[in-house]
Each structure stands twice: as C-alpha cells, then as structure tokens.
C-alpha cells in the first residue's frame, strides 16, 4: 500500500532537506526517492527472508536459469552447490541496515529515463542487519567413499546381492547425502572406480577388481597384444563366459583409455595405474615391507612390458629411508582426515618430520584454488634443516 497523501513529501520539503544537508541539487539526479516503511515491514527482519551475496559468475548462472542447492545433514555445516562448485555458507553482519525495496531504480537506470520523475515515493518492504556470503571450499567427498564401502560389489554370484536390506545409492541419493556439486560427485565416482549397476552406484570389492584386471592382463599376454591396442570386442568374447561383459568393460575403462580406430573400439592400458594397484595388492596385507624385496616382487608381479617406479605410489605408500633396512608401507591419502588441521595432526603423529617431497602427495588435495603447498606448510608446520635437507614438523604438540 502507498503512504497516505499527508505523509508524502513535497518538492519544497525535499529542497529544504537538501539545504539542511548542504547538498547542491544541481549536482544530483533530478529524481528523488522518498522512502517509507510499508505496513508489512518486519517479515524480513524476523527471518522470513535472507540476503545472499553472489559473485558475478554465480549471478549469471542464476539469471540464465540454473539452480543452486543447499546441502547438508542435520549434523553438518550447510554448503551451497552450483552445478560444478561447492561453497561454504557464512553469515556476515553489517553495521549498516540493508533495506529491501521492490522496484527501486539505481542511478544508472534513472539516467536512462527520458522523462525522469521529480519525486518517487517508495515503500521499504523489509530490512536486515546481516546476509549470507559464499566462500569457495573443497567438496566434502570422504563421505562418498564411506557410503559406497558399506556394500561393495563382489560379483553377480555373491550372496550379498541377494540381501535386499543392504544399502545402495542412486545418483539422486548421493546428491542428497554428499556436500558437493553434481560434477564434483561424478568426477569422484570415476576416481573411486565406481560403476552403476542396476541403477545403483557401487565400488568393486578390491579382490574382485584385481580378479577382473588379472583376466584382462592374462588375455593380453596370451594373445601377445600391444598394451596400447587391446580390442574391446575380443575381450568381451573371450572373457564373457568368466565375468559379466559390463564388468570387463568397466575394468578396461578404469585401467585404460578408450579410442576408436576404423569403427573398432580399443583400449590403451595405463601402465602407471596397473603398477599402482598391483603395489596396493602386495602391501595391503603387510604392515611393513622391506623396500628392496618389495621392489623385486612388485616388478615380477606386473605384466611384461611394464616398469615399476616408486613415483607411481604417491599418496598410496610411504618409504622410510631412515630405517635399516629401508621399508615401505601402505598409507593411502583416502584414509586420512578431510579437515586440514586434522590431516596435519594425523601425518605428524605418524612421522615427526617430513620432507616436502614426502608430504606433498598427502596434502595436495587440501589446496584451494589459489593456495599452494608452500602456503599450507607455512601455516600448519615449522621448517628446519636436517643433514642439509629442509624438513617440516608440527606447530602443535602431537600426543
């Protein structure tokens, strides 16, 4: 509703106000906004509405018709997700009162008017002393693996598949549970080598995954195929009687790169991935492994034509050069805490001092868009020299 005529300001009253404020009317736009509170004021102040500050890119997405989703369970801090990014939601207080004024025109809009109005009486719908601001954050993806590991896939003949009570998750289920954008979730599903079976996302039981990979590599060896030219059709024909064709193809996708040549589909096997998963298989049942012995067994265990290297194990295994003999043991970055401080605490509880080369694979994923490994180490550790090598230890006392 508009303010009653008795409360409307006249031109004379506006000019008098400008004079008291010592403002020159000729230096201002001719249109004057006279603000008044509407009878409905108060709804926004009591929490019926909130303001959300958007960066220009997000604003453009919203104006283009894209939607944003706020995700989080009751025990989690809410995040806002666009189609490809995740943002922390933080309340920011402001010393100035923020007014909600529907239809209010900005100075630029007023300049475009051919016949500007002398006085515009505008109602204030509501007000607020705070707003939500967005801060880009890392997607919270540890929960994704945890959910999928509740019911791993051991093959079509497993008795587990007959148990309908076991948890399974569709894409929609994961979007409802995981605090990450859809693109980030789908990318992580690829990292986890997850596959969609019967409409549900599943992680293959490690032993079953190794079994599938062995079928493929043994066939490659028996047929004397080049590692960069493994024909899909022949693989499915030869291995189909042993395992479901979709599982064979999934294995090839996980450990190879698909390409088409003369209408035939081939896969180029990734030697680094195969060497890495073979090392994981060897290390998973050993607390510690003599490094020299491990390297010998490891090289013997991979397909002919592949060469094992320790740099293939970054973020998977750690070498202790100070022990005699030198040892290697499994330390997966996936098993470390998701929070930055908790991650550093965990690493420094395992080893008091780290070189940058050793610790980098275990903190690389903590870096934000513009954050570097060096900045993280400066904030969460202290550096010193040991035998001419820079090492890092905790800033905090680790119990």
From Swiss-Prot:
Protein name, as recorded: Sister chromatid cohesion protein DCC1
One GO CC term on file: nucleoplasm
Record's subcellular location: Nucleus
GO biological process: one example: post-translational protein acetylation
Record family assignment: Belongs to the DCC1 family.
Coiled-coil annotated spans: none
Cystines in this chain: none
Protein encoded by which gene: DSCC1
Cross-referenced Pfam families: Dcc1
Superkingdom classification of source: Eukaryota
Entry keyword set: Cell cycle, DNA replication, DNA-binding, Nucleus
Taxon lineage: Eukaryota, Metazoa, Chordata, Craniata, Vertebrata
Protein function: Loads PCNA onto primed templates regulating velocity, spacing and restart activity of replication forks. May couple DNA replication to sister chromatid cohesion through regulation of the acetylation of the cohesin subunit SMC3.
Gene Ontology molecular functions: DNA binding; DNA clamp loader activity; single-stranded DNA helicase activity
Subunit structure comment from the entry: Component of the CTF18-RFC complex which consists of CTF8, CTF18, DSCC1 and the RFC complex. Interacts with CTF8 and CTF18. Interacts with DDX11.
